[in-house]
Amino acid sequence: MTVLGIMGGSGLYEIAGLKNAAWKRIHTPFGETSDEFLFGELEGQQVVFVPRHGRGHVHSPSSINYRANIDALKRVGVTDILSLSACGSLREDLPPGHFVVVDQFIDRTFAREKSFFGEGLVAHVSMAHPTCGRLADAVHACAREAKFPVKLGGKIGRAHV
């Protein structure tokens, strides 16, 4: 069974319309998550929502404990993750209000742990294709059906201190 994890970016702190909605704290060996997680069901789909910046936007991008968030999603059985971000564009053909279903990212953040691996465990994880094509196609189709201006494929860059 698919369990959809949704990571909300700036301005998205809860999901309206969830049935059987309940906020729960998830503990991880990587420390505290951004906030409690919201569990529920949306149109028959089990959903687990995490407000990435915390409710009330209390965590800056470089202070978010991404490892704890991802580990917690895994611990509660999430199989797919949809991560939403608000950001600007450097392209005139993608003005404010347009959606981009990204297929690649550049992470230039620093001053935070970036890996689950460390002393005693070395691993190499390919980031050549960091997104799920099946999920990207589904999101793109839903956005088009809802008449949102959307582009399939693009890059997102993070460079927060």
Regions found by a protein language model. Name each.
Residues 1-127:
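Metabolite-binding pocket within alpha/beta catalytic cores that recognizes anionic/polar moieties
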